[in-house]
Structures are given as C-alpha cells and as structure tokens.
Amino acid sequence: MKTINYEKLTKDEVELSLFSNFNRYQDVKKCWRKENGDLILKEISFTEQWGPNEYKHLVNCLKNTIETGGTVFSVFENNGNSLVGFASLENQLFGTANQYLQLSSIHISYKNRGMGIGKRLFSLVCEQAIEMGAKKLYISAHSSQETQAFYKAVGCVEAIEHNEALVAKEPYDCQLEYGLF
C-alpha cells in the first residue's frame, strides 16, 4: 500500500535530485484558443517532456518562490522517497484590490495523475492563500484540454482581471481565477 504525504518544502530541500523520478510528460491533442472573444477547442498536437534544462529552471523558480515569502507544497509517496507532485504559491498580492495571489505551478508526475493528488494540492494552496490575505487565486494555465478540465473541475473560471505580465510571458495560456471563501 502506498503512503502519500503532503508537506511544505524549504529552500534547502529544493534541489535537482528531488525531481530524479518525476515525470512531467503530457501528450497534448487539443488546446483552447481565444478567437473573436470566444474560447474554441482546436486540434493542436504536441508532446511535452521536461528534461534537465526544464528541471534546472524549475529548481531556480521554486527556490525564488520560497526566498520571496511564497510557499512550495510537495507530495511524496513511500515515506518521502519519491516526489509525485508539487505546487507553488507566490507571495505578491496584485489586482485592482490586491485580491490575487498567483498559483505559479501545480504538477503531478505522469503515472500519479487521476488519483486526487492535484485536487488535494489545490486545496492546500487555497488554504495557504487565505492565510496570506488573498481573496482569489490567479492561474496562468496551460491551454491543453486536460489541464483546463482539471481547473474547471476544481471550480476555476476565466479571470476577471488579467495580469498583463503573465499574459505577455505565455500568450496561449488561459488566465483563470478561483474565489477563496
């Protein structure tokens, strides 16, 4: 029987070896695109498979999140021996009423998807965001059909306000929000 443990990571725990068994793989067939103000599901096919460069960049990003007061949650199975998921929450409030905190990443290793791990991570991020004074989560999310299905399932909707810096960085991402109650 597998044991699953959720915990916050410290900056010192975020290192490349943490991701040695993590498989960020996605076979994308369809993506959402905005055309004339409407979201349309289009046939856009590609495979994403993170390699050493993506993981090095990720380590730098996650360390920065922690250094700037944000939080990185991790999910381990088998008593902490294997990372199967993580999520990061930034610490800078933004929006016209400083209502948003950014969920900057949430990923589940390929073989561990569909087990509720992502939903539990999302819930932990929400609890933390409330503690940090946010009224809403902001997510600049991959436009793939599967990714958007996850966010819809947890209750996310199109963001009322768009963070233009995030839109410019990833113009095909869907800008989402989640109300924290």
Predicted regions and their residues:
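Structural motif
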Residues: 132, 153-154
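Conserved acetyl-CoA-binding loop-helix of GNAT-fold acetyltransferases
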Residues: 105-108, 114-127, 152-153
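Conserved GNAT acetyl-CoA-binding A-motif
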Residues: 129-142
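Basic/polar N-terminal segments that are highly enriched at the extreme N-terminus
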Residues: 1-4
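Acetyl-CoA-dependent GNAT
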Residues: 14, 21-99, 104, 109-110, ...
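Conserved catalytic-core motifs of GNAT/GCN5-like acyltransferases
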Residues: 138, 157-174
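Short glycine/proline-centered loop/turn elements that form peptide/ligand docking sites
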Residues: 118, 122, 144-147, 164-170
